[in-house]
Design a protein with these regions (language model features):
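A conserved mid-domain beta-alpha-beta active-site/ligand-binding segment of alpha/beta enzyme cores
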Residues: 128-177
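Conserved nucleotide-binding/hydrolysis micro-motifs of P-loop NTPases
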Residues: 27-29, 112-115
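Short C-terminal domain-edge/linker segments immediately following a structured domain
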Residues: 51-56, 78, 107-113, 136-142
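Structural signal for conserved beta-strand scaffold positions within catalytic alpha/beta enzyme cores
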Residues: 47-49, 107, 148
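Conserved beta-strand-loop-alpha-helix hinge of the TIR/SEFIR fold
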Residues: 71-99, 103-114
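A short acidic (Asp/Glu
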Residues: 33-34, 89-92, 117-119
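Conserved N-terminal substructure of TIR/SEFIR domains
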Residues: 1-76, 163-177
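Glycine-rich, charge-decorated loop segments at or immediately adjacent to ligand/cofactor-binding or catalytic sites
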Residues: 113-134
Length: 177
C-alpha cells in the first residue's frame, strides 16, 4: 500500500511543461532566446525564420495575424528583455494582448546571456512600464506594477534561468487566476 502512495505522490508532484509564447526583439536577442529554448525546460513557440519575418513585416495585419495565431492556446507569455525590447512595438502589442486575454505574463532579463559574437549586452528598460491596463479594477496602472520581472545572476545567468524559469512561469499563470 505504501508503494502505491509513493507512486501517487510522485504523480502529484510531476511538473508539466507549459506551452508558452516568447516575446522578444528578434534582431538583437534571437541567439539569447535560442539558448533558453534549448534548455528544454518549457515548450515554446518556434521562431519565425528571418525570411518569413521579412514577408510578414510588409503588412502590419500579417504580423498581427501571426502573433494572434501563435499566441492562442499558450498559457503564458514570457517576455525576454534585452537592451531594446521595451522600444519594440510588436513586443508591446504582445504584452497588451497577453494581459487582455488573461494569460500569465512574466519578464526575464536576458542581457547577461552570452551572444556568440557580441557577448553580453547592457540591460534594457522594463517593457511593462510602457503598457497601461485598459479596463477592469487595475485600469490605468502600468503593468510593471502587476507583472514580475526577473534579473538572473550576472555570474551565471544561463543556469539561474534554467533552474527557475518553470517556477517563474507557474507563478505568472497563478497570478492571473
Amino acid at each position: 500500500m505504501q508503494d502505491l502512495w509513493e507512486i501517487g505522490e510522485a504523480k502529484m508532484t510531476t511538473k508539466i511543461k507549459r506551452q508558452v509564447f516568447y516575446s522578444f526583439h528578434f534582431d538583437n536577442d534571437v541567439m539569447r532566446v535560442q539558448q533558453i529554448r534549448n534548455m528544454g525546460v518549457i515548450d515554446g513557440d518556434e521562431p519565425v525564420s528571418p525570411n518569413e519575418w521579412e514577408k510578414l513585416k510588409k503588412q502590419d495585419s500579417g504580423v498581427k495575424k501571426w502573433i494572434d495565431s501563435n499566441m492562442s492556446y499558450k498559457s503564458c507569455v514570457v517576455v525576454l528583455i534585452g537592451k531594446e525590447t521595451a522600444k519594440r512595438p510588436w513586443v508591446l502589442y504582445e504584452i497588451g494582448k497577453a494581459w487582455a486575454d488573461g494569460r500569465g505574463l512574466v519578464g526575464i532579463y536576458v542581457h547577461n546571456l552570452k551572444h556568440p559574437t557580441t557577448g553580453a549586452c547592457t540591460a534594457g528598460s522594463n517593457p511593462f512600464d510602457n503598457v497601461v491596463v485598459q479596463s477592469g479594477s487595475d485600469k490605468g496602472k502600468k503593468l510593471s506594477s502587476l507583472v514580475s520581472c526577473y534579473n538572473p545572476k550576472t555570474s551565471d545567468a544561463y543556469n539561474d534561468i534554467k533552474a527557475n524559469i518553470g517556477d517563474w512561469i507557474e507563478a505568472a499563470i497563478a497570478s492571473r487566476k
